[in-house]
């Protein structure tokens, strides 16, 4: 596994981040496809054995049970100082309503730390932009979380570049803790972030940790092939309902490049992301250890410029999605 600094921080993270949305009690929350604790723990352990030290979860994943499962596994399988743990705040959890008010942020971080069984998280991220709370209130509360030692750094996710630029400027003006990472929706068939967000992050030294790097499984198999997970994944249906013949052509070229390299589609799709400047660690999700082993090998693949061009050429602009 390769490791890089996360933006301007002193955190060194693996080139792949393990997304923990998959881990959670199926009877909690709104995703019936999640893995219960006994099925989640072996995957987390295998990730650690494979060199992954970066784990991303959220307060809302499976109504908090993702944080509980991840926290217990990391306590059992790793030393706290050897892992980088990121969580998020915004969505409703139990009786905590959706939002980023000061009260919501301060309660949420305490609840997350309790569920994780940790004294601090390395990164507390705002999951979405809150249109009902003044951004100054949100940013000052996040700064207070850092000052209290409950989060080492703060990050953001899924917003317009103009909003992110506004937040960064306010943080500079007030001397508040600045966002060090942006978790955005970015993959071979959704590249709208290349227009404004990625250049902004590169300019500001903000690390990019893309979510859905494999388009929720669509870049791992022949185009149009379905699975039980794809059928039941309402989020994925909303994200990729505008997919068209250009996306199918990209998927076809992905198959060709992967065959040329003797690699899998998923490995090449991740290698493409890792070739982009400013990309710290794509967030991978997996439900089986053998899938994880496959993805771990992506860090060893280097694409040639002509292969990158082959994959990128068919892309056409898409409607902006992923901010809700």
From Swiss-Prot:
GO molecular function, one term: oxidoreductase activity
Regulation: NADH, NADPH or ATP do not increase activity.
Family annotation (InterPro entries): AKR, AKR_Detox_Biosynth, NADP_OxRdtase_dom, NADP_OxRdtase_dom_sf
Catalytic activity: D-ribulose 5-phosphate + AH2 = 1-deoxy-D-xylulose 5-phosphate + A + H2O
GO cellular component, one term: cytosol
Active-site residues from the entry: 61
Keywords recorded for this protein, A-Z: Oxidoreductase
Top-level division of the source organism's lineage: Bacteria
Enzyme Commission code: 1.1.-.-
Pfam families recorded: Aldo_ket_red (PF00248)
GO biological process: isoprenoid biosynthetic process via mevalonate; thiamine metabolic process
Keyword hit for Oxidoreductase: yes
Cited function: Catalyzes the conversion of ribulose 5-phosphate (Ru5P) to 1-deoxy-D-xylulose 5-phosphate (DXP), providing a direct route from pentoses to terpenes. May play a role in biosynthesis of DXP under conditions of thiamine starvation.
Family: Belongs to the aldo/keto reductase family. Aldo/keto reductase 2 subfamily.
Misc remark: Overexpression supports cell viability in the absence of the essential dxs-encoded 1-deoxy-D-xylulose-5-phosphate synthase. Overexpression confers resistance to the 4-amino-2-methyl 5-hydroxymethylpyrimidine (HMP) analogs bacimethrin and 4-amino-2-trifluoromethyl 5-hydroxymethylpyrimidine (CF(3)-HMP).
Name recorded for this polypeptide: 1-deoxyxylulose-5-phosphate synthase YajO
Species of origin: Escherichia coli (strain K12)
Name of the gene this protein is made from: yajO
